[in-house]
Curated annotation (Swiss-Prot):
Source organism of this protein record: Escherichia coli O8 (strain IAI1)
PANTHER family the UniProt entry points to: PROTEIN VES (PTHR37943:SF1)
Protein name stated in the entry: Protein Ves
Upper taxonomic lineage: Bacteria, Pseudomonadati, Pseudomonadota, Gammaproteobacteria, Enterobacterales
Family membership noted in the UniProt record: Belongs to the Ves family.
Disulfide cysteine pairs (residue numbers): none
A Pfam family annotated for this UniProt entry: HutD
Amino acid sequence: MEYFDMRKMSVNLWRNAAGETREICTFPPAKRDFYWRASIASIAANGEFSLFPGMERIVTLLEGGEMLLESADRFNHTLKPLQPFAFAADQVVKAKLTAGQMSMDFNIMTRLDVCKAKVRIAERTFTTFGSRGGVVFVINGAWQLGDKLLTTDQGACWFDGRHTLRLLQPQGKLLFSEINWLAGHSPDQVQ
């Protein structure tokens, strides 16, 4: 289990100067050729997403203005807050900010031939499935994960095991991404 606080994470500026990324975790850890990766991006200007052949990307707008995603003849999609949207990461996708507002989004990328991610918003206590990786990011409220208290802009990632996230207040939201391994693959094979 790895814990993080977005306010304390290192920031990598994009080459095109249109935004920045805070990498949460990759699996396998510290590998450039990852099977899955979670990150948070701040987007300050219109531009294209980086290409990642053989990967699927799920983007969830966390804050800021809506974002229009365009991919040639494939789709035009308005990304709205807390509504995950998946697309192939090997296609050119342009992001256009609405009303010139900076946006922040959560990204999970998975290698299509190895694993698949599912992203959802939780508003109550829940337990994750065993033997699956995952990431949680607190949008608001206070959540208990084991002996750790997680609050706004904090989270955790893990590579396997069952974990209970307990909401400690009447209301709260967190983003939860679960990694499912495809048949013939498991985290044990690559660690």
